[in-house]
């Protein structure tokens, strides 16, 4: 079902077996998103180009995610010729960007260009390679958010769902309702999407929904470790 000229609303039931809830997952049908995803997937893409591809994906996905979501105000401006009606993003409504460190940093620069007045709250999570469980080593979230704050979470890979669920718990416990949250992800997998169905009203914007995970918790076909590839480690 197409929700606009650009965004395809996917029925997750059709994509993920044995799932009873329909998530609000959007995969924008834009050729530039497909192009940069293909660049990022290619194992032969050098680190510097991989990072550029991920940044571009962050920009385009954020553009789509904020299309009908940012609060606006109507006013009148004076052009060089006459007065006319105008619409601005409401500067009094707070916006927060939460990059999941470290891979989320790859998306941050271009996302900030789309949302230049947004505050940035870093959240550092690391996944244990044996248990695949996340732990938090850096939390720059405020004790409480203004309840009207729009939150954009940057998590390039939605794999097992452990990290994003921890992030959602931290954010919602500070006064944010799920319907004010948008998740920007480059590649998503069924296990993470199943868990995120616990949050009604949450919307996820991703370049692709892949088949699943391997024994090490990596998305297949995926694009490898986004942090390692972006930072050359």
What is each of the regions a protein language model found here?
Residues 1-233:
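PRPP-associated nucleotide enzymes
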């Amino acid at each position: 079902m197409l929700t606009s000229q650009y965004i395809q609303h996917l029925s997750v039931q059709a994509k993920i077996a044995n799932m009873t809830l329909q998530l609000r997952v959007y995969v924008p049908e834009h050729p530039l998103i497909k192009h940069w995803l293909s660049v990022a997937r290619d194992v032969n893409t050098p680190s510097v180009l991989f990072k550029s591809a991920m940044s571009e994906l962050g920009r385009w996905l954020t553009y789509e995610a904020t299309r009908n979501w940012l609060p606006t105000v109507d006013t009148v401006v004076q052009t060089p010729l006459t007065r006319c009606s105008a619409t601005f993003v409401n500067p009094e409504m707070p916006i927060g960007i939460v990059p999941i460190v470290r891979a989320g940093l790859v998306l941050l620069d271009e996302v900030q260009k789309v949302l230049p007045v947004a505050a940035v709250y870093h959240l550092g999570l690391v996944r244990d390679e044996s248990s695949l469980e996340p732990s938090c080593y850096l939390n720059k979230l405020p004790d409480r958010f203004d309840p009207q704050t729009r939150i954009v979470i940057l998590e390039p890979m939605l794999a097992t769902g452990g990290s994003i669920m921890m992030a959602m718990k931290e954010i919602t416990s500070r006064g944010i309702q799920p319907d004010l949250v948008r998740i920007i992800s480059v590649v998503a997998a069924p296990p993470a999407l199943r868990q995120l169905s616990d949050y009604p009203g949450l919307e996820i914007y991703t370049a692709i929904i892949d088949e699943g995970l391997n024994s090490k918790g990596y998305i297949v076909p995926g694009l490898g470790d986004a942090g390692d590839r972006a930072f050359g480690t």
